[in-house]
Curated annotation (Swiss-Prot):
Pathway noted in the entry: Sulfur metabolism; hydrogen sulfide biosynthesis; sulfite from sulfate: step 3/3
Gene Ontology BP terms: hydrogen sulfide biosynthetic process; sulfate assimilation, phosphoadenylyl sulfate reduction by phosphoadenylyl-sulfate reductase (thioredoxin)
Keyword set, alphabetical order: Cytoplasm, Oxidoreductase
Cellular compartment(s): Cytoplasm
Provenance organism: Salmonella paratyphi A (strain AKU_12601)
Functional summary from the UniProt entry: Catalyzes the formation of sulfite from phosphoadenosine 5'-phosphosulfate (PAPS) using thioredoxin as an electron donor.
Enzyme class: oxidoreductase
Catalytic reaction list: [thioredoxin]-disulfide + sulfite + adenosine 3',5'-bisphosphate + 2 H(+) = [thioredoxin]-dithiol + 3'-phosphoadenylyl sulfate
Primary residence: cytoplasm
Protein EC: 1.8.4.8
CDD domains: PAPS_reductase
Name recorded for this polypeptide: Phosphoadenosine 5'-phosphosulfate reductase
Molecular function as annotated in GO: phosphoadenylyl-sulfate reductase (thioredoxin) activity
Length: 244
């Protein structure tokens, strides 16, 4: 697999970019997660960053990528509405894995947003999308720009939702290469990796949460629910970071 030209690919229409990366993706599908990270570091341009929501299985990608690329900037977009257990988990993993954590937030505080717009998450899909744009998308765009990122690693998996079921290992999003090393892992592989390396699930896992975001848009799993139905009242799965 030869080195890819990000500028040239960005000039192509989205469909043509997908086609241009098809052969590379076919080869990446045959590699292990660790090999995919190593390939990206050798063949894709820096600077390199890793994003994490510090969700249920976040320790996997944080450990895997950081072991191969120590001190890689880890981007967290903090809404200010995470569970207390989530903030404790962030502190724990940052210390345990010696993460180079970079926290980005909206320009307006949560209280100021509520004063201006009300509780956006209670205002249907449009309100949720505006909330995500303010608290997730804009801070992430700012992070990628300030960190001069050209290659972005993330821990998405196809098994997590229908919206992720057909994602490739390598794509271009927000003008940078996006690499998903564990995209084809199932829950069993995740569990085995955590056990092998002495890592833990998010503390809310034991309380019945399959996916964790903000306190006001996250529900415990109940029988008959798909994982994606536990977020955003089942109206949508993605927070905006991994769309577009």
């Amino acid at each position: 697999m030869s080195q890819l030209d990000l500028n040239a690919l960005n000039e192509l229409p989205k469909v043509d970019r997908v086609l241009a990366l098809a052969e590379t993706n076919a080869q990446l599908e045959t590699l292990t997660a660790e090999e995919r990270v190593a390939w990206a570091l050798e063949n894709l341009p820096g600077e390199y960053v890793l994003s994490s929501s510090f969700g249920i299985q976040a320790a996997v990608s944080l450990h895997l990528v950081n072991q191969i690329r120590p001190d890689i900037p880890v981007i967290l977009t903090d809404t200010g509405y995470l569970f207390p257990e989530a903030y404790q988990f962030i502190d724990e993993l940052t210390d345990k894995l010696k993460l180079n954590l970079k926290v980005y937030r909206a320009g307006e505080s949560p209280a100021w947003q509520e004063a201006r717009y009300g509780k956006l998450w209670e205002q249907g899909v449009e309100g949720i999308e505006k909330y995500n744009e303010i608290n997730k998308v804009e801070p992430m765009n700012r992070a990628l720009k300030e960190l001069n990122a050209q290659t972005w690693f993330a821990g998405l998996r196809r098994e997590q939702s229908g919206s992720r079921a057909h994602l490739p290992v390598l794509a271009i999003q927000r003008g940078v290469f996006k690499v998903l090393p564990i995209i084809d892992w199932d829950n069993r592989t995740v569990y085995q990796y955590l056990q092998k390396h002495g890592l833990k699930y998010h503390p809310l896992w034991d309380q019945g949460y399959l996916s964790v975001g903000d306190t006001h848009t996250t529900r415990k799993w109940e029988p008959g629910m798909a994982e994606e139905e536990t977020r955003f009242f089942g109206l949508k799965r993605e927070c905006g970071l991994h769309e577009g």
